[in-house]
A protein has these predicted regions:
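N-proximal, solvent-exposed amphipathic alpha-helical segments enriched in charged/polar residues
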Residues: 1-33, 69-70
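Conserved catalytic-core segment of NTP-binding enzymes
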Residues: 57, 61-63, 206, 210-211, ...
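Short glycine/serine/threonine-rich phosphate/pyrophosphate-binding segments
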Residues: 111-120, 142-143, 216-224, 246-249
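Glycine-rich phosphate-binding loops of nucleotide-dependent enzymes
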Residues: 174, 216, 229, 337
Length: 365
């Protein structure tokens, strides 16, 4: 083959590779940008629409094997880049200024570990190179101040109107828990709660973010409705455990987001398997396969199956969640993979095109 024919064959082979996180070929994702020959072999630039930190060695090895299977044996150097775009939100709403994507983490039932999933998702995206914030929308029972090691700290206001978020482990955070005493109960009616959420979101100086993770309260009440009607959400993640009682409520949460035209990115099955802290024995104490069955039932992705491990609880309670406390541990890997799958699921959604169209102003004469 001529050099040009070789490069064309390499590009075709690369574009035929099915990325495990996207679930589609690199060609369909328009991810292969440049293919060239170098003195040492071949070079390819791959651009993906999700945070890719730490993924380059895995992808390079997989693509090398893929090319070898196609009969192309030349050494391959992969330049992997991330290009996170703003994605479409509910009709009649526009993305929030410098925040490209708002991702709601929700559950129909309390006690399934949703806040632990939300904070580790935010931290995993940060570790993978994204700019991330987290909004604790559980006004009645905020958990993020404790999990992020920020209990007792207060945000400042540069102008008396806006708040600067607190920063922990590289994540910008805002919570009602930063503004009230830790032991003060929030005895508020629905309108006060929804107003508080709106202010926390709109009056915080988030800066430029690729993702804003919203840690939702359990259920399908006022806060969820406010989020759907007033906040431009690019996608939702539903957290459940494998047991039937949790799955029943998770289904309600999923249907609620569908009803208000918020796309569901997928299901996270938390507490999927119990890991004994003494011997490492694993056991499905809450059942097995519930999250996978639910994902299949509703035609969405299973984003992750996360372990029930005493270390995860201890690390979150200590203000250093697992992704930060033990990033190379076996218990952290499912969180990192879950974050990559979630980012990839969002990357496949329709992009926001509003910035491409001029504003039309109708003046009366």
């Amino acid at each position: 083959m001529t050099p040009d024919e070789t490069l064309s064959a390499v590009r075709a082979a690369l574009e035929a590779y099915v990325d495990p996180y996207l679930g589609e070929t690199l060609g369909a994702a328009q991810a292969v940008r440049e293919v060239s020959a170098t003195g040492a072999g071949l070079s390819a630039q791959v651009v993906l629409g999700f945070a890719t930190g730490g993924y380059q060695p895995e992808l390079a090895n997989a693509l090398g094997r893929h090319l070898a299977a196609a009969g192309i044996e030349a050494p391959l150097a992969i330049e992997l880049q991330s290009d996170i775009k703003a994605h479409a939100v509910q009709r009649n709403l526009k993305p929030l200024g410098d925040i490209r994507n708002v991702v709601a983490v929700a559950s129909g039932k309390g006690g399934v570990g949703k806040s632990t999933v939300a904070v580790n998702l935010a931290l995993a995206w940060t570790a993978q190179g994204a700019r991330v914030g987290i909004l604790d929308a559980d006004i009645y029972g905020p958990s993020q101040p404790l999990m992020l090691g920020l209990v007792g700290q207060r945000p400042t206001s540069p102008d008396g109107k806006h708040l600067r978020p607190l920063v922990s482990h590289g994540v910008s955070a805002m919570s009602i828990g930063f503004l009230v005493d830790a032991e003060q109960p929030m005895v508020w009616r629905g309108p006060m709660v929804t107003q508080a959420l709106t202010q926390l979101l709109g009056e915080t100086q988030w800066g430029e973010l690729d993702y804003l993770v919203v840690d939702m309260p359990p259920g399908t009440g006022d806060i969820q409705l406010t989020l759907a009607q007033r906040v431009p959400v690019a996608g939702a993640v539903i957290v459940t455990t494998p047991q039937d009682i949790a799955l029943a409520d998770a289904r309600k949460g999923l249907k609620m987001f569908e009803k208000v035209s918020v796309p569901v990115l997928g299901i996270v099955e938390n507490m999927s398997v119990h890991v004994c802290s003494s011997c490492g024995h694993t056991e499905h104490i809450f059942g097995a396969g519930g999250g996978e069955r639910m994902a299949r039932e509703y035609g969405v992705r299973l984003l992750g199956e996360l372990p029930l491990d005493a270390h995860i609880r201890e690390e979150a309670d200590g203000g250093r969640p697992t992704v930060v406390a033990a990033p190379d541990s076996p218990r952290a890997r499912p969180y990192l993979e879950m974050a990559r799958r979630t980012g990839a699921a969002l990357a496949l959604r329709a992009r926001d095109r509003s910035a491409l169209f001029p504003k039309i102003v109708v003046e009366e004469t």
